[in-house]
Structures are given as C-alpha cells and as structure tokens.
Amino acid sequence: MKKIKKKDIVLYLVMLTFCIIVCAPLLQMHIASDTYNFMDLGYFQYPSQYFLKDARIISTLFTYLAGILNLDYQVFIVGMEVLAVIIASFSIYILYKTIGKKLSENIYNMNLKNSIILMAITIIIFNCMSLEYFLYAECAVMCLSVLLSIIAAKIFIEEKNKHKYVKILLILTLATFCYQGSINIFITLVTLLLIIDKSKVNIKENIKQFIIAGIIFVVSEIVNIICMYLINNFMGSEQERVAGNVIIRNILLFNPLMKFIIENVFILNFNLWPSMIIPIFIGISIILILCSKKKIRGLIEYIFLILVAVLASILPVFLMKSPGIEPRMVMSAGSIIGISIIYLSYIFNDEKSKIMQDIIFVITMIFFIFNTINTIQIFSAHIATNKIDANMGITIKYKIEKYENETGNNVTKVAYRRDSMHRDFPYGYKKKLSSFTQRAFDNYYCIIEALNYYCNRKFEKTTMDEKIYTDNFLGKNWNTYSDEQIVFEGDTMYICTY
C-alpha cells in the first residue's frame, strides 16, 4: 500500500479548511423545500417514493440506515452536510493532483501556476450550478456522485491496463446510483485531461479515447435507466423521469426548450452568478488564446471543450418526460469558467508566457474571490429564508392553538391559495437565488408539509372555499405575514400566502 505523504495530508487539510469556511452557513439545521417532504414522509416512505423510483439507490440506503438508527432529522441533515464538506474537499484534492501533474513540476509548491490551477478547481467544484449539491438532506450522496465521476476521469487518463474501462464503467454507474445529474462532469474532465496531457499528443488516439469515454458515459446512463425501469416494475409503479419515446416530442420542442436552457443556464445562471458571466468568460478566453502561439489549434481545442461541457449537460434533457432544467443538472456547463482557466494555464504553460500567466492569475484571483464570497452569501441567504419560514410557521402554530382554545374546535384541514401578486422568494431580495431562497409557504410542493413541521401536526389538504376567498383574500396583496391571511371555519384553516 502506498504511503501517504505528509505533504498530501497538509494539502488536503488546506482544501478541507477552505470547504468548511465556504459551507459554514450550512453546517447547521437547514431545510430545502424537498426536505419538508422528506421529514413529513419519513426515512422509509420518502426514499421509497422518490429516490428508489429514480434509481438513486445510494441515497435510498443512506436514508434507510438513518431510519433504522432512528436518527433525529437535525442530526441526519447536519451530519450529511459535514460528510458533504469532507467529500467535496476530496474532490478538490484529487482533481488538483490529477490536473497539477499534467501542468506542474511540483504540485506542492504554491507558485503562481499551481495557485491558478487550485483556484480554478475550487471554481469547478463550487460553480453556480453545483451549489445545490450542498442544499438537500441527501447532500453527501450528491457530492459523492461528483467525487466518483472525478475518480473515474482520473483512472481513464492515468491507468494503462486493459481492464480499466470496466472499472470506470462500474464507478460511473455507481455515481448514477448516487445522483445522475452530476456525472456529466466526467466526460468534460476527460476531454480536458486528454487535451492538456503532454503524453497524449496523437490526435487520432485522443479522438479514439474521447469516443470510448463517451460510450462509457452513455452506457452508465443506460444501465441506470434500465435499473430505474426494473425497480418501478418490481414496485408496481411508473417512473416519471425519462422515456425513450419522448425524444421526438422533445426535439419538436427544440426551439422553446433551447431558449429556456440558454436563458437560464448561460444568460441568467439561475441568478446564482452575474448575468452573461459564462459567455463573457468564453469571449475573454478566446481573445487570450488568439494571443498565443497555438492560435488555430488552441481555438479548435477550446471550442470543442466548451461544446462537450454544454452538450453533456443539455442532451439528457431530451430524454425527460417533463423537459426542464435545474442548476444541479448542469454541473458540466457551470464548470466552463474553471476549465477555461485550466486550459488557458495549459496554453501559456512556458517561461516565455510570464506576462500572460500574470494576466490569467489576476483574472483567476478576482473570480475566485468573487465566487467564494458569492457562495457564502447564497448559503447565508438560504439560512435567512429558513428563518423567515420558521417565524411564519411558529406564528401560525400559535394562531391555531389560540383559535382551538377559544372555540373548542380542532383544526385538521388546510386550504391555501396565493395572493394577487405573490413572490416565491423573500422581500428584501431583488431576485430569487434558485432553490436557496424558495419560500416554503409559497411553494405548493411543500406548504402542507411545512405547516406539519412547524405545527407538529398532520394536516389534511382541502380545497379553498370560494366565498371565504372572495370575502377575505380576493385582490389583496401582502409583502409580509399578516393575521389577515388566515381565516378559520370549523376544523379548517384557510390561508392566503404572500
């Protein structure tokens, strides 16, 4: 067994410290919209109803185990977040060593070149699309999927034996059983590593290796889909994610679907990065590449790399029964800025390019600082949103108890509707930060479940009484909680959310 060097331990601890600082806001009890449903259904029903049907077997096993151990939800959620931080730091560590060996003589010497590589890798792991991997109750398993994809890419490039492809397929398939949406980073990293690996200068061989990597990527997804169908068939249920017969329908929707993807992923970045930052960075990278000695080849390689990153993210959407996209599904597209920096470092990886290396370092440092602060702010905004939801939930709880004490009625049913100009993120924020600032009491997916959590009850959902709605809520608009938003009648609470 290879002895672990002291330098490697120090290197990992530095990366772990960075991850702890960035994720510090989430190292406490926090609740995403899905988490309300998770806590409402419990450790066994929720994974059976959601994870297992989607062939997310590892997430299912984790939650089953927590149920067997009868863990408190707070212990489970915080524990999974701690585990996610540890796993993410391993992802940075392994990716840094893998890429660093291709571009640097000594990866332990934190010179300008290595600093660029390390900052770029943290931007890849903590890109705006992958931040949701730290949000949900199963966050550690989602981060594990990323780590397994990175390990698969590392083995693909570094190992020479004949059996490596079987090993990679098994690892990548295991990654799909954690979370399918993150494995698109595998093919993007393989493409990047093939390009920057000086030992792989044969273009035909590189194309062959890329095709093999693509086949492994597709086969792992197919295996996951087959398992999905088998599991649902065994359970007597119908899976709701993917189907081969919807490809033609989704292709016919190509224009509106691509418009939606381009707008949200590449222009707005789901409001998690500044608008247009990815296209702008691609433009800057192209300008810098045109200043290099390898103008033509560099441009071809870079454009191909970007196309792979984009297509790996968006092509699976065309298999979906309900085509749509969320940040967590397109980590590969979000990694474009990080991989662009690494490619630029490769292009100008010689002593004569000192000025260009300085320029790349300044650009990288500016974006690294921004991304770190931005990530902490996004995580903090999620905690602030949780507190707003908690305040409203606890206030409603006391209001219900007061009504019950005064009338003797027992509230068992809830009907809800939104006000005339509702917004699903807190007032005080100019824009919604994806799922991080999604208010529970404006999300039809989890309003009842949030009420159940804060009131410690099991309410029954019922329909809104039109007369009560017209008399009390019609045309009204609030920007904060008000007692006017709640009306009681018998055993039913009618609520109009703002």
Where are these regions (language model features)?
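Membrane-lumen/periplasm interface segments of specific transmembrane helices
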Residues: C23, L71, F210-F281, V317
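Transmembrane alpha-helix segments characteristic
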Residues: A120, K294-L319, I366
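Hydrophobic, aromatic-rich transmembrane alpha-helices
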Residues: W273-L299
